[in-house]
Amino acid sequence: MQPPPSLCGRALVALVLACGLSRIWGEERGFPPDRATPLLQTAEIMTPPTKTLWPKGSNASLARSLAPAEVPKGDRTAGSPPRTISPPPCQGPIEIKETFKYINTVVSCLVFVLGIIGNSTLLRIIYKNKCMRNGPNILIASLALGDLLHIVIDIPINVYKLLAEDWPFGAEMCKLVPFIQKASVGITVLSLCALSIDRYRAVASWSRIKGIGVPKWTAVEIVLIWVVSVVLAVPEAIGFDIITMDYKGSYLRICLLHPVQKTAFMQFYKTAKDWWLFSFYFCLPLAITAFFYTLMTCEMLRKKSGMQIALNDHLKQRREVAKTVFCLVLVFALCWLPLHLSRILKLTLYNQNDPNRCELLSFLLVLDYIGINMASLNSCINPIALYLVSKRFKNCFKSCLCCWCQSFEEKQSLEEKQSCLKFKANDHGYDNFRSSNKYSSS
């Protein structure tokens, strides 16, 4: 026996009302409707099923731009959790990322090849040529060794990670890669600072004419540079971890600085990281170089009238070394400026609730990717800069790379002897000059 039609209609209406009420109740309790969940993009990091974690860095802006905006407190129902309104998604950053994926791969491969050849050749030149083993060149060798360590370990892993999109290694490699990268940058920064100070000391004390070999103070400087760089890179190894990301129905593993840190120090480090990197790893070497090179210029102008003709060759050598160090600092500044500029602009100008944020976000992402490529170039460009600026390094590079002679040692042996004899002759002439001035003044 079938129920009356009126009863069927009433039951259907009651069922529809019940479904509607349950849907409204679910939305008020924080459960989103079926079609209200925003499309997850590549930078949205989630810990299933309810919590969303955002990475810190250039892609974090993309993730936050696609995240739901929070409703003001005045519009919430008392006792209910915050509801969100989805802002319109930005499509430009996705296309930018796909474009720069291949550009970054080509640049990284170029840096890998040039960096290994250039830095290895530079280390070999300083090791084989005895007259090249002085204080500034040993610091340059330390800088090249740090760059070589970064090139051999970090660049292949970063290229593989960029193409695979999913982190293919374990948590140990996730911590090791940023640790080595930050230690390498620290070695570069502190080595440039030490070179600038060394050039001022060389000009300020004309009597401090060095022979062949590594001074003890330079060896202590190198040890301190490496120890301090490693210590300052430890927070990177502590803070980085693997996070699971829900993307289009599949889970991806991403290596990044974890948004939730366990200690108060690491939470502060995560918050102030961009400003710390900008101040210590960028502004510090530029400020120290500007300060000591200003003092060095004033010292050279003050003592120029009292110089002897016999010291002209030695003075030219010191000026060439000073010019080389200044060129290395200038290359460092040009390579790292776009990356630091993009991070600082992101911190100061970007607002995820701004309706015009997509244009600014696209510009910042382009600047960030350009900065990443230029920062990678800094690992291989120092040998090229030395080749272009220093005549001695240029001759050594030609002899070692182009094989213009049968043996590098055979060709350089005569030049080494002549250079050393000339160096000692200038030293002897300067001693005679000092003794004559001493007796004349007495």
Swiss-Prot record:
Annotated phenotype, changing residue 383 to L: In HSCR2; familial; loss of cell membrane location; new cytoplasmic location
Lineage, opening ranks: Eukaryota, Metazoa, Chordata, Craniata, Vertebrata
TM regions (residue ranges): 102-126, 138-163, 176-197, 219-243, 272-296, 325-350, 363-389
SUPFAM superfamilies: Family A G protein-coupled receptor-like
SMART domains, per the entry: 7TM_GPCR_Srsx (SM01381)
Extracellular-side segments: 27-101, 164-175, 244-271, 351-362
Gene Ontology biological process terms in this record: aldosterone metabolic process; calcium ion transmembrane transport; calcium-mediated signaling; canonical Wnt signaling pathway; cell surface receptor signaling pathway; cellular response to lipopolysaccharide; cGMP-mediated signaling; chordate pharynx development
Effect seen on changing residue 137 to Y: Found in patients with Waardenburg syndrome 2; likely pathogenic; decreased calcium release upon endothelin 3 exposure; loss of downstream pathway activation upon endothelin 3 exposure; no effect on cell membrane location; no effect on internalization upon endothelin 3 exposure
The protein's name in its UniProt record: Endothelin receptor type B
Cytoplasmic side: 127-137, 198-218, 297-324, 390-442
Disease per record: Waardenburg syndrome 4A: A disorder characterized by the association of Waardenburg features (depigmentation and deafness) with the absence of enteric ganglia in the distal part of the intestine (Hirschsprung disease). Hirschsprung disease 2: A disorder of neural crest development characterized by absence of enteric ganglia along a variable length of the intestine. It is the most common cause of congenital intestinal obstruction. Early symptoms range from complete acute neonatal obstruction, characterized by vomiting, abdominal distention and failure to pass stool, to chronic constipation in the older child.
Cellular compartments annotated: Cell membrane
Family matches, as InterPro entries: Endthln_rcpt, ETB_rcpt, GPCR_endothelin_rcpt, GPCR_Rhodpsn, GPCR_Rhodpsn_7TM
Entry keywords, A to Z: Albinism, Cell membrane, Deafness, Disease variant, Disulfide bond, G-protein coupled receptor, Glycoprotein, Hirschsprung disease, Lipoprotein, Membrane, Palmitate, Phosphoprotein, Receptor, Signal, Transducer, Transmembrane, Transmembrane helix, Waardenburg syndrome
The species this protein was found in: Homo sapiens
A Pfam family reported for this protein in Swiss-Prot or TrEMBL: 7tm_1
Residues carrying Phosphoserine: 305, 419, 440-442
Family indicated by similarity: Belongs to the G-protein coupled receptor 1 family. Endothelin receptor subfamily. EDNRB sub-subfamily.
Modified residues annotated as Phosphotyrosine in this record: 439
Signal peptide range in chain numbering: 1-26
